[in-house]
């Protein structure tokens, strides 16, 4: 079977890579990205769209078997690979280090993220001059959804609801701005960027949960993405207004989102974090993607 590399064409390849990620999740969960992360990245206004054409795709006679790409900018690179093609690892790493370098705090070069369970990939990375940087690793935790779902608790006067009940982009913008520790009120000229994030093709308003304060403001938010073709779901993002933390509101939003996914058949929820916030509600660390750094050759 022949193998060939070509460059990414967004109009042609965006949906094809979504399907590829869906297929390899079913074959080998969750070593590669889940499809919603690809979709969320492309809905985010911070993504560098000028250099998408530098993404590389490998294909066999039946379609895509590997992709090298960034999430938001050059220099922070991810590799998605069909487990049937381990022989492509060296070529894909070499491509990343040669063609996808960026200007970062560490200097000019690139980080490539590799699942720690893939020790062979790590050996190849080291042989090519990459160095592991644990301080930049990406943890992954999962929540195995129990048959008897835990009771969800809320303080008096607060409620949870979905964005299908009320879709107020300005309220979402405010809780996300404050929830990610930005002081004051959010810039009004960023509301349309927020709307774009909430308009991805597979975004589900009915699974995305907010906690509503007595004054009607959203004070906690949990985004939820079903993983196509599976019984998994992915949490992204979660934020709580700092004035309303340690009240159980974030936990209530996350659990209500998971509960709704479970009602549709989900059996596991994933989140890209190992924070105590998630572990305290029953998540367990299930994997880590190590960041491997290589400075650009002069």
Task: Please identify what each model-predicted range represents.
Residues 1-40, 152-187, 298:
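Short amphipathic alpha-helix that is part of the acyltransferase structural core
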Residues 10-15, 22-103, 114, 212-232, ...:
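Conserved donor-binding loop and adjoining core beta-sheet/short helix segment
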Residues 53, 105-107, 206, 266:
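Short, high-confidence coil segments that cap the C-terminus of an alpha-helix
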Residues 64, 71-157, 289-295:
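Acyl-donor-binding surface of acyltransferase catalytic domains
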Residues 86-99, 240-242, 246-263, 270, ...:
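Conserved acetyl-CoA-binding loop-helix of GNAT-fold acetyltransferases
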Residues 110-113, 235, 268-273:
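Conserved hydrophobic beta-strand within the GNAT/NAT acetyltransferase core sheet
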Residues 123-127, 278-279, 283:
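Conserved active-site tyrosine of GNAT-family acetyltransferases
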Residues 180-227, 238, 251:
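Phosphate-binding active sites in nucleotide-utilizing proteins
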């Amino acid at each position: 079977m022949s193998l060939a590399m070509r460059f990414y064409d967004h109009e042609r390849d965006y949906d094809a890579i979504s399907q590829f990620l869906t297929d390899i999740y079913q074959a080998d969960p969750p070593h590669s990205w889940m499809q919603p992360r690809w979709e969320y990245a492309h809905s985010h206004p911070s993504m560098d769209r000028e250099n998408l054409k530098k993404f590389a795709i490998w294909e066999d006679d039946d379609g895509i078997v590997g992709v090298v790409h960034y999430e938001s900018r050059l220099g922070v690179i991810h590799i998605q690979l069909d487990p049937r093609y381990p022989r492509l690892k060296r070529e894909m790493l070499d491509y990343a280090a040669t063609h996808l370098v960026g200007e970062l705090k560490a200097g000019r070069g690139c980080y490539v993220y590799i699942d720690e369970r893939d020790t062979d990939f790590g050996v190849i990375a080291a042989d090519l001059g990459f160095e592991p940087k644990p301080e930049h690793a990406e943890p992954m935790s999962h929540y195995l959804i129990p048959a008897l779902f835990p009771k969800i608790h809320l303080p008096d006067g607060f409620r949870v609801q979905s964005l299908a009940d009320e879709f107020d982009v300005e309220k979402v913008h405010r809780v996300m701005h404050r929830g990610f520790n930005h002081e004051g009120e959010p810039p009004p000229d960023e509301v349309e960027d927020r709307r774009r994030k909430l308009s991805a093709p597979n975004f589900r308003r009915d699974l995305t949960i907010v906690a509503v304060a007595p004054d009607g403001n959203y004070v906690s938010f949990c985004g939820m993405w079903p993983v196509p073709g599976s019984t998994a779901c992915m949490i992204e993002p979660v934020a709580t207004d700092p004035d309303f933390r340690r009240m159980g509101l974030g936990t209530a939003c996350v659990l209500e989102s998971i509960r709704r996914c479970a009602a549709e058949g989900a059996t596991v929820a994933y989140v890209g974090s190992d924070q105590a916030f998630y572990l305290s509600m029953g998540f367990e660390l299930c994997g880590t993607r190590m960041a491997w750094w290589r400075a650009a050759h002069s």
